[in-house]
Amino acid sequence: MEQKIVNIGDIQVANDKPFTLFAGMNVLESRDLAMQICEHYVKVTDKLGIPYVFKASFDKANRSSVHSYRGPGLEEGMKIFQELKDTFGVKIITDVHTEAQAQPVADVVDVIQLPAFLARQTDLVEAMAKTGAVINVKKPQFMSPGQVGNIVEKFAECGNENIILCERGSCMGYDNLVVDMLGFGVMKNASKGSPIIFDVTHSLQMRDPSGAASGGRREQTVELAKAGLATGIAGLFIEAHPNPDQARCDGPSALPLDKLEPFLAQMKSLDDLIKSFADIDIK
């Protein structure tokens, strides 16, 4: 099966191309921290030769608790993103939660993300599609891998075929997520070769059954990322923080920022090896 290529400026995202890193921080905590984290990512990815797109949310609209930090909001968030682009020349991905956000966000960033909890909302899909932007679709935790083809078709019917699909784990009973490694191939087939990326960070979440915030298993980041890349995918989606225990959202799943370079060096070596192999067609 021919693998589709989605272009983000000069970055080619495809399952048979060198992996692209979609990474940054969970939510914009401050302008200064965003600058610090983005600068580190750019430095490391430039050194290792890894295509890079900075990720952060300007509004975490789906927090469990009404008391949890959501972010700086649309206006301030776009100002920070524009400064990051102007300063570092970086591509940016962020999520939108309402139809009204789609165009203003697409005017600034390079990729707009459809959140997992909203992936079947047709009005939101239509609004995002009409921007013409590259779209990253988070596969819902409650959706089987084969069903992602319906979402891709919905975007295509709305006039946008620049679709990336993102695996972020599946519900396993209450409060736990697992990643089905067979699902990556199913998603490729169901979407007719769309690029698949792997959100390692959020796949490591493990909720406290009675708490308001997610726990996590960041100590297993490396093994999970290696397993995903071994299936031959287009990219990784990672969140890091200089002090994960002080992060304002999903710290327990975040990669410590000082581990980024050794982590990515291993991931690049593995990806290069996997993609050096010829395909074996088994019917």
Curated annotation (Swiss-Prot):
The protein's enzyme class: transferase
Domain of life assignment: Bacteria
Enzymatic reactions: D-arabinose 5-phosphate + phosphoenolpyruvate + H2O = 3-deoxy-alpha-D-manno-2-octulosonate-8-phosphate + phosphate
GO MF entry, a single one: 3-deoxy-8-phosphooctulonate synthase activity
UniProt xrefs under PANTHER family: PHOSPHO-2-DEHYDRO-3-DEOXYHEPTONATE ALDOLASE (PTHR21057)
An annotated GO cellular component: cytoplasm
TM annotation in the entry: none
Family from the record: Belongs to the KdsA family.
Listed pathway(s): Carbohydrate biosynthesis; 3-deoxy-D-manno-octulosonate biosynthesis; 3-deoxy-D-manno-octulosonate from D-ribulose 5-phosphate: step 2/3; Bacterial outer membrane biogenesis; lipopolysaccharide biosynthesis
Principal location listed in the UniProt entry: cytoplasm
UniProt keyword list: Cytoplasm, Lipopolysaccharide biosynthesis, Transferase
Enzyme Commission number, as recorded: 2.5.1.55
Descriptive protein name: 2-dehydro-3-deoxyphosphooctonate aldolase
